[in-house]
């Protein structure tokens, strides 16, 4: 549905870490979006991206909080928006191996058909797990309403009474 209105006040902020590269995201509805490289694309953990809409940039320009902001999160310099971070300057120096890994996976993504193919593969993976769960008599989805199943955060539960009563150590091995 259209639950994020175009004529809204305030900013819409989305942590898209699980959804980026695996689900359709209407980026036009978001003012701030974040994701980590490794969640859906693999690679090195600990690196993230932040995307600002023009509305978010305007908010940064016009709002100064009354509390101190850690240097890593300061988006202003000398009371002006710090445009350096939008033109290639990094806030914190990432490993160049990690950057190269990310560029390599983006090139691979392009070769296999782009974002549409990544989303298709993610949905196919969920369908494979659905088929397996349906054929199983010892496991089910934790999410009981299958309309709410996610192709990026799959949680399963044991349903076989013999398995449920096993020790935690045994369950961990399953």
Per-region residue spans from a language model:
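Short, catalytically relevant binding-site loops at active-site mouths
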Residues: 19, 125, 148-149
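Active-site rim loops that border cofactor/substrate pockets in soluble metabolic enzymes
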Residues: 127-134
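Structural motif
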Residues: 9-12, 31-34, 48-49, 130, ...
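Active-site C-terminal subdomain of aminotransferase-like
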Residues: 38-127
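Internal gly/pro-rich beta-alpha loop/helix module
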Residues: 22-40, 45-48
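Conserved C-terminal alpha-helix-loop-beta "cap" of PLP-dependent enzymes
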Residues: 134, 138-174
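Short, well-ordered coil/turn elements that cap or connect secondary structure elements
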Residues: 6-8, 27-28, 135-136
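Active-site phosphate-binding strand-loop segment of PLP-dependent enzymes
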Residues: 1-21, 32, 40
């Amino acid at each position: 549905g259209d639950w994020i209105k175009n004529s809204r006040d305030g900013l819409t902020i989305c942590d898209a870490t699980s959804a980026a590269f695996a689900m359709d995201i209407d980026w036009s509805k978001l003012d701030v979006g974040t994701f980590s490289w490794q969640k859906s694309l693999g690679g090195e953990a600990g690196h993230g991206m932040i995307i600002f809409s023009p509305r978010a940039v305007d908010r940064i320009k016009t709002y100064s909080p009354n509390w101190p902001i850690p240097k890593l999160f300061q988006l202003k310099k000398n009371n002006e928006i710090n445009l350096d971070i939008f033109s290639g300057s990094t806030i914190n120096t990432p490993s160049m191996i990690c950057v190269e890994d990310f560029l390599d996976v983006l090139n691979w993504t392009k070769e296999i058909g782009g974002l549409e193919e990544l989303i298709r593969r993610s949905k196919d993976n969920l369908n494979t797990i659905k088929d397996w769960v349906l054929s199983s008599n010892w496991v089910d989805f934790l999410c009981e309403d299958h309309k709410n199943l996610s192709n990026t955060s799959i949680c399963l539960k044991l349903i076989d009474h013999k398995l449920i009563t096993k020790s935690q150590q045994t369950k961990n091995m399953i």
